[in-house]
Amino acid sequence: MKEQAEIGATDDGGLHRLALSDEDKEIRDWFADQMITAGLTVRVDEFGNMFGRRAGTDPDAKPVLVGSHLDSQPYGGIYDGALGVIAALELIRTLNDNEIETTHPIEIVNWTNEEGSRFQPAMQGSGVWAGAHDLEEEYAKTDVDGDVFEDELERIGYKGEEPCEPPEEYEAYLELHVEQGPYLEENEKDVGVVTGIVGFTWGAITFYGEADHSGPTPMHYRQDALVAAADVISQIRRIPSTLGERTVGTTGYIDAKPNSINIIPEEVTFTWGFRDPSDDVIEEARRRVLEEAEWAAEREGLEWEYEDRMRAPAVQFADGCVDAVQTAADDLGYDSMQIFSGAGHDATHMHSICDTGMVFAVSENGKSHNESEYTSWDDCYAAASTIANAAVDLAGGAK
């Protein structure tokens, strides 16, 4: 973990390793070397997803896939994603060290661009692999500088030859991830047994008003796009409390034009996002925010439009995988709790391919997506041990 954290390290102990950047190439090269050293058969698909395979005793048995991602948020933490990939690698090393054979092959994976920071959407590599996104459409995506995804993938040398699709049926997919929330720590638990992932909806609203001088223009003459935006943003904060304990709402982006201290804003675009374990609750939150936008536009005399940017239904993990993780935690003597993930992960897409499960490691103070993200080594070990035992159980090996 410390070694991988040096690649893209920030001055404040975090990680800046965006997808398809030079730092991403460096960590991919490092990970490929680690897999080869561990005796794995390595392959890279046409979207840059990296796989390493350890053979099982039954050549016809479906593989168990374990992994996460190595890209990071801008100035993010060293555990997000990387802990899951390193734990998968350590699983292989432990099996090798103890000469443990499994009936099913075990594969480990580093998914391309889980974070969605440089190229959107998030969970891009697993989404293409699982058939949720079109390959050519995702190849054409650009970042803020106009760099094209496919060009950047080729530039770093990770546009592989394998098709970006499952080459065979899979027995199961397991993913270890830091919780990125406070619930495990608040409840003094060692690990989290994840039962599913919240659904979410993201969108953007744009109000169109009229720019004017901020001094001579009377208040009743104004068509202020930012006033309407502020009204709706305040409702995005309030709506979740009326819907459920696990409902959350966020405005993470706002752009005002002409963005001058002396001009009434004529155009404002901002985003909204809601998450909840219930798809019905998510849709109700979306309906309410659009209703609030319509009212705000009428009050201020504005035109407005909205864009649905991304939706993902809530995911319920397979009982067999949840039970395997729960049994592993119990057998190891860890105090665990079953928990719904409040964030999206590659497991969201893998759910459509095969039985899927997740393990959460404790996040100190619930912090993530920033440089202060922290999980103790004891908590890393607990989560890694749990997913290792669960994977071996599903793969038909002795723990």
Language-model-detected regions and their locations in the chain:
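His/Asp/Glu-rich mid-to-C-terminal helical/loop segments that flank catalytic regions of hydrolases
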Residues: 213, 220-242, 288-291, 361-399
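Alpha-helical metal-binding/catalytic segments enriched in His/Glu/Asp
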Residues: 66, 75-115, 201-207, 213-239, ...
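Flexible, glycine/charged-enriched surface loops at secondary-structure junctions
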Residues: 43-45, 101-105, 161-164, 216, ...
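Zn-dependent metallopeptidase/amidohydrolase metal-coordination segment
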Residues: 1-10, 67-68, 335-386, 391-394
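Active-site-adjacent substrate-binding region
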Residues: 6, 10, 146-195, 233-238, ...
